[in-house]
């Protein structure tokens, strides 16, 4: 993709997200979503293969459907209340429509089917944008309308998403699909706490974005897309592969890594709100995600696949690729647990 075109597309994606985040008017919010969606499609199609075209089409259909439901909810709210503002949304029918539309945009269960297929069909860099930046706008709207959201509706979607995210990743060998199912599960954790403590949802989103960005950057660094290629990366990048496995366990929420922080704080927040069964179910279902991450770690680190290269290290190395943001991102993704008491202000 030529640099001028890339600059225009990237600026449109960023502008669309900023419009959604800063707007308190439903029409401007909807326009921001449309800017974001239409600008990200060329990013998904940049490889110009049948698979990427199919993935971009699936993404467009899912997002366009969600946008139509969102507009239906906005118009219903306008007819019943006579206002375009996002704050003080008192009508429950319109609020439910908007919540369903936003869950579809996020890929929460039961509207999660497009997420693994689209992520698998695009390149690693496009998948990184899809699973990180594209989550910011819908979650910012959920944050703004959280007082008017039906807690039961979001709780059902959250528990179903954590279950689907853990169950769906069990049989996967494609790393992009594993991260897609991980995204579904993480979105479920964020949705679960949205109606009780939206600021905690924002913290979870920040931690998730940093961990996922680090993982995708390391996959791009080592050119790994499957479990097999990741195990072969030991020959060329033993340190990078070790970092990938640590990030995987952090994404799974294994203490004492940083991924444990949001799960810990969300369970604590739900318990403070006299929710006992829900956090118990969430913690049990999170073991499914942790299991496939641990299995991936075991398959990669302890059971090396047969390879024609008999040496542990290659004598000739490629030139080092410069990734300036990678080091601080990895530190944040793995070593933030001691700072948890400082974050308790969110509770």
Curated annotation (Swiss-Prot):
A GO BP annotation: mitochondrial electron transport, NADH to ubiquinone
Location (main, coarse): mitochondrion
EC number annotated for this UniProt entry: 7.1.1.2
Annotated catalysed reactions: a ubiquinone + NADH + 5 H(+)(in) = a ubiquinol + NAD(+) + 4 H(+)(out)
Ranges that cross the membrane: 3-23, 25-45, 60-80, 93-115, 149-169, 178-198, 200-220, 237-257, 274-294, 323-343
Cellular localisation: Mitochondrion inner membrane
One Gene Ontology MF term: NADH dehydrogenase (ubiquinone) activity
Pfam families (alphabetical): NADH_dehy_S2_C, Proton_antipo_M
UniProt keyword list: Electron transport, Membrane, Mitochondrion, Mitochondrion inner membrane, NAD, Respiratory chain, Translocase, Transmembrane, Transmembrane helix, Transport, Ubiquinone
Cystine residue pairs: none
InterPro entries, sorted: Complex_I_Subunit_2 (IPR050175), NADH_DH_su2_C (IPR010933), NADH_UbQ_OxRdtase_chain2 (IPR003917), ND/Mrp_TM (IPR001750)
Membrane topology (UniProt): Multi-pass membrane protein
EC main group: translocase
Entry GO CC: mitochondrial inner membrane
Stated family: Belongs to the complex I subunit 2 family.
Subunit structure and binding partners: Core subunit of respiratory chain NADH dehydrogenase (Complex I) which is composed of 45 different subunits. Interacts with TMEM242.
Known function: Core subunit of the mitochondrial membrane respiratory chain NADH dehydrogenase (Complex I) which catalyzes electron transfer from NADH through the respiratory chain, using ubiquinone as an electron acceptor. Essential for the catalytic activity and assembly of complex I.
Protein name: NADH-ubiquinone oxidoreductase chain 2
Source organism: Potos flavus (Kinkajou)
Lineage per the UniProt record: Eukaryota, Metazoa, Chordata, Craniata, Vertebrata
Gene label: MT-ND2
